[in-house]
Amino acid sequence: MANYVYTIFLDAGHGGSDPGAVYKGRQEKDDTLALTLAVGEILESYGFRVIYSRTEDIYESPYQKAAKANASGAD
């Protein structure tokens, strides 16, 4: 039986100048990044290859993220 390794592309959403929803100083961009990194870590521990749209507080347009995802070779 073949041992398949899957590549997963995770998009944290928002970032940089786009905070997403904001409530009492809490910004959605921070929550989405933390959650994406945590999920990615779990997936990596199971042997998946994970590619992230961002790992720090930067902004990329939806078009840029889609192009990055399409070029990543993710399954």
Where are these regions (language model features)?
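Catalytic-core regions of hydrolytic enzymes
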Residues: 2-75
